[in-house]
Amino acid sequence: MSQKIVILGSGESGVGAALLSKAKGYDTFVSDSSMITEAFIAELQQAGIAFEQGVHSEEKILSAQLIVKSPGIPEKAPIMKLIRSKAIEVISEIEFAYRHIHPGAKFIAITGSNGKTTTTLLTHHILAQLGYSVGLGGNIGTSLARQIIHEKKDVYVLELSSFQLDDMYTFKADVAVLLNITPDHLDRYEYKFENYTASKFRIFQNLTPADYYITYSEDSVIESYKKDHPVDARYVPVSLKQLYSAGAYSDEKTIQIHALDDTVVTCNTEEFPLQGKHNYINIMAALNAAVSIGADIHKSIASIKSFRNAPHRLEFVGSIYGVKFVNDSKATNVDSVWYALDSMKTPVVLIVGGVDKGNDYSQIEALVKEKVHTVVALGKDNSKVLSGFASMVSEIKEAHSMVEAIRIAHDSAKKGDTVLLSPACASFDLFKNYEDRGTQFRNLVIELAG
């Protein structure tokens, strides 16, 4: 009798896990308390996988020997409390896929509160340009479980969220990257920053002295936590202050990086499509990761020039009468806005707001005072933004739709200014998600420019 596996959640990771489970011959059942999309229903039916939607049937779920949980389901969900009370093993889709991975596959795993998507995409781009057989997965693109059913890659570059890391146990990366840790998603961690930090550090679990780990060496949270939780692997630092005996350093004009033969290679940052200190950190991390699995440093550097970042991340949309419009809708916390403002070279009209996560806007006060002359508060309830920025800028205005926000921002901007959408907040008060918010911004700007 085959092992019974229940998949909780029917997004890309859940359906991918279900398809892999079925392919491996397990008794597979999918349960989602929400409605499953038509496309995913068709896939499940074609594969002969039983499922339910709009409900969690306790009897069916609690009869499982193994549960693969989608990352969006919190531990406080009633069904999870029941599962935990029965001591049924719960793992993530990544962990499930890892347990069925083909021998010899290597993993580059990347996490961080900010920058992980860009760094993951860039690392994948470098290796693909250099001819590696490389897959992209995790919190981005196609689920790892789906990928390994029919296709075997030599290397997988994975973006991993804290939610995914929480349910990973035997997974081991060959190269593990932790970019930074700033407060985020604390509602999932009992509002304790130390719990969130511990979750991020799971990226280093099971590393051996033959493996590599990469961090931004000036991140005080990472450095402090490392003192009590040392990592047993080869350290490859990324720094904006100095060049260590390994890793990479940027003075913002250049990047210096150790090659495999330990020679130091220097390149000019002006050659890269990604600009700003935060992006130099991302570039150095990606280069270090590629070099750590054997990539040629010179070819890796050259490949970056053809990279195009994912949408909604400091995406230049266009100019209207000399005013630049930049879409940074993915900036859903204060730290992301700090990085965005730090990269700005012109005076800024800042569109900010949405569903506040308990933000402390004083963290960006110095940069706002230096670079921003007008704030446009965009949201249903703008009270926290209005009070948070009132003492920082000469002008602060309210908008309750993207159309209104762009009109106000454009009217407030002078030739040579930049209108920056970098909200620092979640989007679901006025928009479906951050992509919807960014897409509306982009489309309206293009329409105005036309």
UniProtKB/Swiss-Prot annotation:
Record-listed ATP binding positions: G112, S113, N114, G115, K116, T117, T118
Any GO BP annotation: cell division
Keyword Iron-sulfur recorded: no
Catalytic activity reported: UDP-N-acetyl-alpha-D-muramoyl-L-alanine + D-glutamate + ATP = UDP-N-acetyl-alpha-D-muramoyl-L-alanyl-D-glutamate + ADP + phosphate + H(+)
Cystine bridges: none
Major subcellular site: cytoplasm
Keywords carried by this UniProt record: ATP-binding, Cell cycle, Cell division, Cell shape, Cell wall biogenesis/degradation, Cytoplasm, Ligase, Nucleotide-binding, Peptidoglycan synthesis
Enzyme Commission number, as recorded: 6.3.2.9
Organism domain of life: Bacteria
GO molecular-function term, one example from the UniProt record: UDP-N-acetylmuramoylalanine-D-glutamate ligase activity
InterPro entries assigned: Mur-like_cat_sf (IPR036565), Mur_ligase_C (IPR004101), Mur_ligase_C_dom_sf (IPR036615), Mur_ligase_cen (IPR013221), MurD (IPR005762)
Pfam families for this protein: Mur_ligase_C, Mur_ligase_M, MurD-like_N
Coiled-coil region(s): none
GO cellular component terms attached to this protein's record: cytoplasm
EC class (word): ligase
Functional pathway: Cell wall biogenesis; peptidoglycan biosynthesis
Record's subcellular location: Cytoplasm
Function comment: Cell wall formation. Catalyzes the addition of glutamate to the nucleotide precursor UDP-N-acetylmuramoyl-L-alanine (UMA).
Homology family: Belongs to the MurCDEF family.
Protein name per UniProt: UDP-N-acetylmuramoylalanine--D-glutamate ligase
Native organism: Cytophaga hutchinsonii (strain ATCC 33406 / DSM 1761 / CIP 103989 / NBRC 15051 / NCIMB 9469 / D465)
Gene designation per UniProt: murD
